[in-house]
Curated annotation (Swiss-Prot):
The gene is rpsG. This is Small ribosomal subunit protein uS7. Gene3D superfamilies: Ribosomal protein S7 domain. GO terms for biological process: translation. It comes from Salinibacter ruber (strain DSM 13855 / M31). InterPro entries: Ribosomal_uS7 (IPR000235), Ribosomal_uS7_bac/org-type (IPR005717), Ribosomal_uS7_CS (IPR020606), Ribosomal_uS7_dom (IPR023798), Ribosomal_uS7_dom_sf (IPR036823). Keywords: Ribonucleoprotein, Ribosomal protein, RNA-binding, rRNA-binding, tRNA-binding. Part of the 30S ribosomal subunit. Contacts proteins S9 and S11. HAMAP family: Ribosomal_uS7_B. One of its GO terms (molecular function) is rRNA binding. One of the primary rRNA binding proteins, it binds directly to 16S rRNA where it nucleates assembly of the head domain of the 30S subunit. Is located at the subunit interface close to the decoding center, probably blocks exit of the E-site tRNA. The lineage of its organism: Bacteria, Pseudomonadati, Rhodothermota, Rhodothermia, Rhodothermales.
Length: 157
């Protein structure tokens, strides 16, 4: 193990349109093969579609609500103790909460059967903001797993 201090955290620049760090991170999560301009276009067009669908609500607010609804508080991690592997519930760090929410929203948006990624992402974000959709279901499943394995919580990491 290294005796050095922990490396300093990298920070992402806020995105140029909304001046929001979370949107910038979401663009990076959407991006494939380094095509950031395409990822930005998908995210910004998604926010426009959300505003059209919901009417009065702003796309950024729906996005933040969706991420908050899809972010897990606890997760289970495998821990090997004396030949047996236990699923130990652990609290999720704030950074990881948001990262998991992004990952799940994008995963379930890509699995939808709609024409473009913009429409699929908009539908998933609107559903997640309402407390529905695949990403929120995944969060609930994760919480359920942690609840059912509460007995192993004393095997903390």
């Amino acid at each position: 193990m290294s005796r050095n201090e922990a490396p300093e955290q990298r920070t992402t620049q806020p995105d140029p349109v909304y001046r929001d760090d979370m949107v910038s991170r979401f663009v990076n999560a959407i991006m494939r093969d380094g095509k950031k301009s395409l990822a930005r276009r998908i995210v910004y067009d998604t926010f426009d579609v959300i505003e059209e669908r919901t009417g009065e609500e702003e796309g950024l607010e729906v996005f933040k609500k969706a991420v908050n609804n899809a972010a897990p508080l606890v997760e289970v991690r495998s821990r090997r103790v004396g030949g047996a592997t236990y699923q130990v519930p652990t609290e999720v760090r704030p950074e990881r909460r948001i990262t998991l929410a992004f990952r799940w929203i994008i995963q379930y948006a890509r699995a939808r059967n709609e024409k473009s990624m913009v429409n699929r992402l908009a539908s998933e974000l609107v559903d997640a903001a309402r407390g529905e959709g695949g990403a929120v279901k995944k969060k609930d499943d994760t919480h359920r797993m942690a609840e059912s394995n509460k007995a192993f919580a004393h095997f903390q990491f």
